[in-house]
């Protein structure tokens, strides 16, 4: 009798254990199903003129915004890019997969080449916006524009929107990367906020020189990284305000930030050398105190606003703070 009772007890233990395992498995299955249910099948983006409903997990993407391209790469989906303007890529994007096909230039898309790729999604840019109607006939077309008056909030929002195309894991990674970038931004900003140095940003272009203000294409420097602008009134236009050597000397900035557009689009750097050796230029506090930052021109002029490009931009300007 005792043996029978012992056997019954043992069987009961096995049954309970089996039930427990089933419950755990069921629970895991339920969690997996719930996670899958949370994944969106569509997201709503914009092309600057209208909202665009886009299916998530696009397999074939054509990208004209290089900052978005580097965000896609950082999130782990570079193989989903099938076409880009490959002629004038900045150096940091030269190692993209060879499978990516050329789709025209950064300002003039090759419509036939794009159509032949049969993309699920086209990510246009401000430079290609005039081709929007032609592009959206091929595939849903969106633009991730940047608000220069609210630069970092605009960029981080775009990064999150790009991540939303690829699901929860991508969104989680994007949040981690944004948090890391914000920590790096704060380190630079803290140094600049304690400084009294005034900064002038200049662009060199085919022998000419233009100055840019705090709400220009260089807003990241002033709004986010907290470089202090000079007291000079500079028009915040897309191409900047024409500036002479006499004007630079009169402003006498403590820091000068230089971008060579000629170099960015494939020219040489001789203009920068000429300017740096100019007698009036040498009389500024910036040159006297070795506080001239020569930006990585192709990075700042052709790209920006992406996860990787933002990291590199921060590294570019940290040099003068060390």
Question: Can you name each region flagged by the protein language model?
Answer:
Residues 118-124, 140, 248, 252-256:
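Proline-aspartate-enriched helix->loop->beta-strand connector
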Residues 87-91, 211-241:
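Alpha-helical, coiled-coil/dimerization segments enriched in small aliphatic residues
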Residues 140-205, 291, 300-322:
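Extracytoplasmic substrate-binding proteins
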Residues 90, 130, 144-161, 197-220, ...:
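Extracytoplasmic ligand-binding site segments that recognize negatively charged/polar headgroups
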Residues 4-6, 19-67, 170-200, 263-268, ...:
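Bacterial Sec-exported substrate-binding components of ABC uptake systems
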Residues 60, 65-113:
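A short, structured surface patch at a secondary-structure boundary
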Residues 60, 154, 254-322:
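Structured C-terminal subdomain patch of bacterial secreted/periplasmic proteins
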């Amino acid at each position: 009798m005792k043996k029978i009772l012992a056997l019954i007890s043992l069987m009961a233990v096995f049954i309970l254990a089996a039930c427990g395992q089933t419950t755990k498995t069921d629970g895991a299955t339920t969690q997996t199903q719930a996670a899958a249910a949370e994944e969106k099948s569509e997201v709503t983006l914009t092309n600057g003129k209208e909202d665009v409903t886009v299916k998530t997990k696009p397999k074939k993407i054509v990208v004209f915004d290089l900052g978005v391209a580097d965000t896609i790469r950082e999130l782990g989906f570079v193989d989903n890019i099938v076409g880009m303007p490959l002629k004038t890529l900045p150096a940091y994007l030269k190692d993209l997969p060879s499978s990516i096909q050329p789709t025209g230039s950064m300002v003039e898309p090759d419509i036939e080449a794009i159509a032949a790729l049969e993309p699920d999604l086209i990510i246009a840019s401000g430079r290609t916006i005039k081709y929007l109607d032609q592009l959206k006939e091929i595939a849903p077309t969106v633009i991730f524009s940047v608000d220069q008056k609210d630069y970092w909030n605009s960029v981080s929002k775009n990064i999150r929107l790009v991540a939303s195309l690829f699901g929860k894991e991508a969104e989680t990674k994007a949040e981690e990367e944004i948090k890391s970038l914000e920590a790096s931004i704060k380190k630079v900003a803290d140094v600049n906020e304690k400084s009294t140095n005034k900064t002038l940003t200049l662009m060199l272009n085919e022998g000419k020189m233009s100055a840019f203000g705090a709400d220009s294409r260089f807003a990241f420097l002033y709004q986010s990284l907290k470089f202090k602008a000079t007291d000079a009134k500079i028009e915040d236009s897309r191409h900047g305000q024409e500036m002479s050597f006499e004007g630079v000397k009169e402003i006498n900035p403590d820091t000068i930030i230089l971008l060579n557009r000629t170099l960015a689009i494939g020219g040489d750097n001789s203009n920068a050398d000429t300017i740096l050796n100019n007698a009036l230029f040498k009389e500024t506090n910036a040159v006297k105190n070795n506080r001239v930052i020569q930006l990585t021109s192709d990075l700042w002029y052709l790209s920006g606003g992406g996860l990787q490009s933002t990291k590199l931009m921060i590294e570019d300007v940290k040099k003068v703070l060390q």
